[in-house]
From Swiss-Prot:
Pfam families: PC-Esterase, PMR5N. GO terms for cellular component: Golgi apparatus; Golgi membrane. Keywords: Disulfide bond, Glycoprotein, Golgi apparatus, Membrane, Signal-anchor, Transferase, Transmembrane, Transmembrane helix. This is Xyloglucan O-acetyltransferase 2. One of its GO terms (molecular function) is xylan O-acetyltransferase activity. Belongs to the PC-esterase family. TBL subfamily. It is a single-pass type II membrane protein. It is an enzyme of class 2 (transferase). Residues 1-18 are cytoplasmic. It comes from the Eukaryota. Residues 39-425 are lumenal. Glycans are attached at residues 85, 183, 259.
Amino acid sequence: MGSPFKDHHTLHPSLVRKLIPWTFYAMVPLVLFRVYLYPYPLHHTTTTILTSSPVSPPPALLEDETSCDYTDGNWVPDRRDPLYNGSTCGTIKEGQSCIAHGRPDMGYLYWRWKPKQCKLPRFEPNTFLQLLRNKHLAFVGDSMARNQLESLLCMLSSVSPPNLVYRDGEENKFRRWYFESHNFSISVYWSPFLVRGVEKSNTGLNHNQLFLDHVDERWAADMNGIDMVVLSIGHWFLHPAVYYEGDQVLGCHYCPDLNHTEIGFYDILRKAIKTTLKALVDRKGPNDNGFDALVTTFSPAHFEGDWDKLGACPKTEPCKEGEKTLEGMDAEMRQVEVEEVEAAKMNSVQLEKFRLEALDVSKLSLMRPDGHPGPYMHPFPFAYGVAERVQNDCVHWCLPGPIDTWNEILLEVIKKWEYASRREQ
């Protein structure tokens, strides 16, 4: 299936000639308006920034844009092309570059999330960079955190190319980019539990170990140099694991060969988030410069069959309203995360410059079974016919794809915070 607007790219030549003069005169006031509101250049500057850049006013913010229930809405057709593609963005993980890997249908690119009560604007890369000028944003968590980070990097790269300034570890699990144009850094930290953990391996443990009363210092040790953090975990809690608290075994999840009590993973996820948010409040809450934190809620998978069979996630369009309901494990994981964010907000209410929100993307993600790589996690999987086993990724998201909407909402949360800060001044 192609774009639902497959013919919208074609214009008759005579119509084009008529439109050009009109377009020119129509653009003049728009250009002047943009220069007035957006003083920063659209393209990457070569000026070397050795110290913090002076903070200039961010774009004008409208009060009616700062309050919205983004969870209540629908996916509607959208004529506009994505801000980037596999050839214009070099940070897309190979397994999420669906078009470059031969995915034939393009329709999944032409939808936008429309909240029922308000407007969700298209992502504005310049606005994001202006609001985060002189700051360091970190994405911390599992591969969904990395997926969201790479989406954001690609959209920002459409106006200002970043420089990769740090890399450590296998599979690009720890990286940092620098936007010289705005003295702005973005990092990604691999920490699938947020708390201290030992991951299972092919040569060692056949289960994970989690130490629930200790935050993972692999990322937390850098907290003093971070201004905003986006936390994203969940899927790794489904794996077999043994849990420790106070140096004692608390229990386990799916450990039939061990003499431990089976306690599942919902309460463990809650403890991990609670420990993490408490560490943020304790270490960054008293900071006079302020600190912002967001928790991206659980993103449902869309397996409709065996992961290694053709058709594991075959959909090519979003779900319609009422077609799917957030329930079971997906709903429980989201609820735990939202509840712990609200509890941490109550515990930090006296900290004026500590801001915390849940980036609630569970429902809108549930409604996009068409947005996963599926078999196109590998290049041209059917070039030699359909094999007996076809590996599918029905968890992560194609880039570009529905996950770009997460960062549109992220920007709106930041704009809401900025508006509140201005109003208080």
